Structure formats: structure tokens, C-alpha cells
């Protein structure tokens, strides 16, 4: 079993004399910056000129600089930008300021693991990856709690890389919940696999296929939406709260029997073979190469697929039905 580390295992004082630059101020960026600031760390934010996030960061009491200036001032540089832009920003604005003893940090291992970013040998390269969205990282911190994190060391030039990563995780509240040590390879490959096979690709395809099957059979699209999309959250919440057993304990016997007897007919040996193939494409770097090439050529296929998916009939049906949900209007 993997070992979890908690508050008593990490020493935040290690970062006391460090200036931490958060590059990016989106979902994760704002949470990391504010949590570290509230933990007593000296935090600055690096943003591109004209960023709409600059005002938000300044209003939160943070000093904002252009990325290159923030990288120059900082001892620890946490890159919290989309995967596809990290290489260019790193090469042009961060790498020139990586002096011996600095710490380069990430919240996802994609660019390091697949060789898009190759750091100099005289800096620590670490990862701290909260297993939750930024708003949850921030909210739980403010409540005196935290979101579990993964942490990893790719390069330990100082001999303190591990302690520094754990201190950073403590600063954003991770050790309150528990942090788990991994590697850049393991985090990257499992994260991509989960996204593609289960959380995003698999779930989206399953929802659409179920919806389309019912509509094709003559059932009202609104009912198909309720049964195949809307109720997903109800089931997932039960799974998250207590695992599959908790979910099965909470549903009807009819639903549970259907789960056991019909579910395996959906995820067949052929499905598992495709899962293995997708994993192999991730491990070999094939997916990474496809993604990098797609972005280098202006994202034509990605843009077309995004447009096509947005026009699926389930989106129009959902838009009308969600207007009925009073609890969504309160957000």
C-alpha cells in the first residue's frame, strides 16, 4: 500500500526564505497562490501582458509581474499553464532565469515526462498535483481542511527536492488531507488514461451512446437525457462518498441486479482490449505526439471535433431542461 504523508511529515519553514512565483492565475493558479500566501510564504504571480487575471490577483493582495520578471525574482517557479503552451513560455521566459539552486515545479508531468521541457541539471524539478479543482483546493483550505495531493521528484539537484515539494504541498493545504509520493511517469500516464478511458472520453461516449439508443428507439429525448446524463451525478456522488459498494447499497435491488448482469455486457473483452491499446499509446508517447502536433498546426481537428460535439442534440435538450433546475440558477 502507498504511504500517505501529513502535516507532521512536512516542514513549511524550508520555504521561508524563498520567493514563490505562480505562473498563471486560473483555477489552480489562484488557489495555489492564495493558499501559499495565507500559509506565510512570499508569493508573486507571473502573467502575460494584458492578462485579464492580473486585476484579480492584485485585488487579492498579490504582486503581479510579467512571466520573465517573475521567473527572475523567484526561487521556486510553479508553472500552472495549459500543457500546450508550457513549452513556449518556458523556453522564452523562464529558462533564461533558471539559476543553480532554483526549483522548477509543475502540477502535471506531461511536459517533463514527454520531453517537451528539458530543464538544466542544476535545478530541482518537482511536482505537486492536487487531486481536485482549484476552487475546491481553495475552499477546503479556508475551512481548515485540504485536498489530497500527489508529489514527485524528477530531479533533485539540491538534495532537498523532496522536502521542498512536501513543504509546498503543505503550503497549499495538501498535507491536511494527505499527500502521496509518485513519479512524473506514473502521474502522467495514469492521469491521461483516466481522462481518456473513464472520466472524459469513456463517460462522454457512454452517455451519448445511451442517449442516442433511447431516442432512436422512439423515447422522448428529455427522458433519455434524465436517464443517461442527469442522473450520472447522483450515482457518482454515491461512489465518491463510499465506493461502488456504497452506491450499490443505496440503489434499488432492480438497479443493482441490472448492474451485475448487464454491466459486463457493456465493458466487454473487446472494450478492455481497447483500454489496453489506449494505455499503450499513452506509454509510447503516441498520444503526446498527436497532441503536440495538433497544437503546432493550429488545432484544426481539435477545433472541428469541439464544434461537432457542441452541436450534438443532447446539448440542446440539456440546455432546455437545465433551465428547470432552480438549484443551478442559484450558482
From Swiss-Prot:
A GO BP entry is: isoleucine biosynthetic process
The cofactors it requires, by name, are:
Mg(2+)
Q: Which InterPro entries match?
A: 6-PGluconate_DH-like_C_sf, KARI, KARI_C, KARI_N, KARI_prok, NAD(P)-bd_dom_sf
E.C. code: 1.1.1.86
What PROSITE patterns does UniProt report for this protein, alphabetically? KARI_C, KARI_N
| Cofactor note text | Binds 2 magnesium ions per subunit.
Query: Which reaction(s) are listed as its catalytic activity?
Result: (2R)-2,3-dihydroxy-3-methylbutanoate + NADP(+) = (2S)-2-acetolactate + NADPH + H(+); (2R,3R)-2,3-dihydroxy-3-methylpentanoate + NADP(+) = (S)-2-ethyl-2-hydroxy-3-oxobutanoate + NADPH + H(+)
Kindly state which keywords UniProt assigns to this record, in alphabetical order: Amino-acid biosynthesis, Branched-chain amino acid biosynthesis, Magnesium, Metal-binding, NADP, Oxidoreductase
Entry function? Involved in the biosynthesis of branched-chain amino acids (BCAA). Catalyzes an alkyl-migration followed by a ketol-acid reduction of (S)-2-acetolactate (S2AL) to yield (R)-2,3-dihydroxy-isovalerate. In the isomerase reaction, S2AL is rearranged via a Mg-dependent methyl migration to produce 3-hydroxy-3-methyl-2-ketobutyrate (HMKB). In the reductase reaction, this 2-ketoacid undergoes a metal-dependent reduction by NADPH to yield (R)-2,3-dihydroxy-isovalerate.
Name of protein = Ketol-acid reductoisomerase (NADP(+))
- Give the gene that encodes this protein: ilvC
